UniProtKB/Swiss-Prot annotation:
It is found in: Membrane. GO terms for cellular component: apical part of cell; apical plasma membrane; ciliary basal body; cuticular plate; cytoplasm; kinocilium; microtubule cytoskeleton; neuronal cell body. It is a multi-pass membrane protein. This is Kinocilin. It comes from Mus musculus (Mouse). It holds the Pfam family Kinocilin. The chain crosses the membrane at residues 13-33, 40-60. Residues 80-124 are annotated as: Disordered. InterPro entries: Kinocilin (IPR027837).
Amino acid sequence: MDIPISTRDFRCLQLACVALGLVAGSIIIGVSVSKAAAAVGGIFLGAAGLGLLIFAYPFLKARFNLDHILPAIGNLRIHPNSGPDHGEGRSSNNSNKEGARSGLSTVTRTLEKLKPGGRGTEEG
């Protein structure tokens, strides 16, 4: 039961599905009262956006020569700045532990301030 379809007809059907998803998502979000209904509309919009990306990918690939760009993007690495104290003979393991303790004490102080009757909520 295979029905032959031309590439042009397939692209038109694909674009029609994207347009239907955008319209349906916009209408659902526009008339929704609850957050759950708005979330469903957002799912429709996200699916339509993905469909649009799939639709446009061959054109973008031909226009911007993505075969050279995508591997370069994949090779990017993010290296956090190492602190100046690494050169003073301290191991990075100790500095990471001290940084975690410092962050934990900051969080603990903040939580103490937020507690009812805590140190930061004293009334004078």
